[in-house]
């Protein structure tokens, strides 16, 4: 593919507020479902994450999904977990991604196998997400695999990691984030956080440590569908920060889908004003069609 398109790396390095979104890879042997979802988001986001067997259930591979995203003219973010592959498979997948022009890679542990629908599957965890970052760093800078074998062509990965927004204690040292930066992470995407004041306190500490100069921080949110889904996220979804005030606001609305979009747009506007926040990551697997209007309402232009 020769079509030029905005790259997440360039957007972030230019100082523009980035909008990324997530598409769950479909349970399908066809590209049609993926292409339809991409069409919904095109023109409304800078990059699209493609999940890697979310919920520990079998889906189209993230690599294939990312290739489809790229073919549709949007910068993909390949998600790669430690759960399903050993170090050989991970290095092979990374080389394949680079060959396909897929440079954004988000490293994750992966959901526990016990949460999935194939309980007898074996979790691999040969290496952890930090090691994947070091692999990409070596492929980028040294042009070598873990064994020291030279690549014929170096990679140009833009590596990322994940984080959970939390209340920073007085003596909080973001050691894990610092390690990710040292291992080569260039951006961080967080789990859902609908609490602006908490984001301010969390990011203020990040800025104080200088980490916001080493990595770009993209805060996870999404347009809610209902107060029921907001309650479920608060109680069941790992890493989610959902204030009661958001749930009450959803409960009091006669049009909860619109209210959810309004809340998300307002959060984007608020995040733009926080020093050290470089973007918003929109996750709405069952409400994907609400993302374009939400982004438009926030005043962000792609």
Regions found by a protein language model. Give the residues of each.
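N-terminal amphipathic alpha-helix/helix-capping segment at the start of soluble metabolic enzymes
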Residues: 1-24, 28, 36, 144-155
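Active-site-adjacent beta->alpha loops and helix N-cap segments on the catalytic face
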Residues: 2, 6-9, 30-32, 56-68, ...
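Active-site mouth loops of central-metabolism enzymes
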Residues: 18-32, 76-88, 157-172, 250-262
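Hydrophobic faces of well-ordered beta-strands that scaffold small-molecule active sites
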Residues: 19-23, 46-50, 76-80, 105-107, ...
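Active-site beta-loop-alpha junctions enriched in small/polar residues
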Residues: 23-26, 51-55, 81-83, 110-111, ...
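Short, acidic/polar
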Residues: 28-41, 61-62, 88-94, 169-179, ...
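Glycine-rich anion/phosphate-binding loops
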Residues: 82-100
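Active-site pocket-lining/capping segments in soluble small-molecule metabolic enzymes
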Residues: 123-152, 162-167, 209-267, 286, ...
